[in-house]
A protein has these predicted regions:
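Active-site pocket-lining/capping segments in soluble small-molecule metabolic enzymes
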Residues: 1-344
Length: 344
């Protein structure tokens, strides 16, 4: 039959297949028709779709699924009973090379900077050869590179390695070949190298990553499970303060002033920025686990990251965040995101 494209306001009829009343894979369920069986309103859809039943699994099927689940759980890495609380090392993510001076602040162990043409050019204005800064600077590869950019960043990585920078943070599998042929390089995984379970962590370890970063969307329970297996996995860093990236895309947002706040119907605010040909949408409130550092320490977290790339490490806001970090005090107008409420 000839089908039409469904548009907003069109009426849609649901056809229940003649297969015992249940939907099966491959069934053509929705089609446009002239009869107003129901509108696309949530209430009408719910009333109609509630009539669709899911077949009950047989006892044999339930037993097979239960056995598969038990076998999968039994094959996981063993968890330690109670992780030993250790001192936490802090890495600060800055906005520009001048932010490297945050390394002079007490309690700051490392400094991280996104590798861009601007930060590479600004490196000339900083005495990065200081003996007390050696080995403490991490360069992060941007998550999205296109076309000839990959080769340009490959050359930049080689140049930085030649200047004594040995630590780099990756954000996807495509970054690994950049470091082919380079010696004495330490590769770290960013939060986009998703590590939501121990099997993922082991896979990244096999690929050569010596440190991993927990996903910004992770929750307390899952982080605890990962940290309980720390003896068998690469060290896991947890970001305790960061802008919350909602979207990163090449699609431009027209007619919006960079940095302005857009308000959704539910009241949520989003800030839009245009950088290096990419559109970055950030949540109005930053993610913050400040106030939970003692708990993370008891869970076995030994590496924490404070991302000040939006405001700058030496700005008034940056100093406020670092002071709150030192005191383990929560900051207003921030959100713990999924940490307390759990993964949806």
């Amino acid at each position: 039959k000839k089908l039409k494209v469904v548009k907003a306001g069109d009426f849609v009829r649901v056809r229940i297949p003649d297969k015992g009343g249940f939907f099966q894979v491959g069934d053509k369920v929705f089609k446009v028709g002239g009869k107003a069986a129901f509108t696309m309103s949530p209430e009408a859809c719910r009333t109609t779709l509630d009539q669709v039943a899911v077949p009950e699994k047989s006892p044999a099927q339930k037993e097979i699924l239960a056995q598969a689940r038990s076998q999968g759980l039994a094959s996981l890495l063993p968890a330690s009973a109670s992780p030993v609380a250790s001192a936490q090392t802090l890495t600060v993510r800055g906005r520009e090379p001048q932010d490297m001076h945050v390394l002079d602040e007490p309690g700051v162990a490392g400094f991280e900077l996104v590798l861009t043409p601007e930060t590479l050019a600004g490196l000339k204005k900083v005495d990065h050869h200081r003996a007390d800064w050696q080995g403490r600077v991490i360069w992060e590869i941007p998550p999205m590179l296109f076309g000839a950019e990959w080769d340009e960043y490959r050359r930049a990585v080689g140049m930085l390695a030649g200047q004594g920078f040995k630590r780099f943070r990756l954000n996807n599998l495509g970054h690994l070949p950049m470091f082919a042929g380079l010696s004495e390089i330490s590769l770290l995984g960013g939060f986009r190298c998703y590590t939501l379970n121990s099997q993922a962590a082991l896979a990244w370890q096999e690929l050569g990553l010596g440190e991993l970063t927990a996903d910004l969307e992770d929750d307390r329970k899952n982080l605890q499970e990962l940290l309980r297996r720390a003896d068998h996995l690469p060290p896991l860093a947890i970001t305790i303060y960061s802008p919350l990236v909602v979207m990163l895309s090449r699609i431009p947002v027209r007619g919006v002033r960079p940095g302005s706040v857009l308000r959704a119907e539910g009241g949520e605010g989003y800030r839009v920025f245009q950088r290096h040909g990419l559109t970055e949408v950030l949540a109005e409130q930053d993610v913050s686990l400040l106030g939970h550092l003692a708990e993370l320490k008891r869970m076995g977290c030994t590496r924490i990251i404070v991302d000040l790339s939006q405001c700058g490490a030496l700005s008034a806001r940056g100093k406020q965040v670092l002071a709150a970090c030192a005191a383990d005090q929560p900051l207003p107008e921030t959100t713990p995101f999924n940490y307390q409420r759990g993964l949806a």
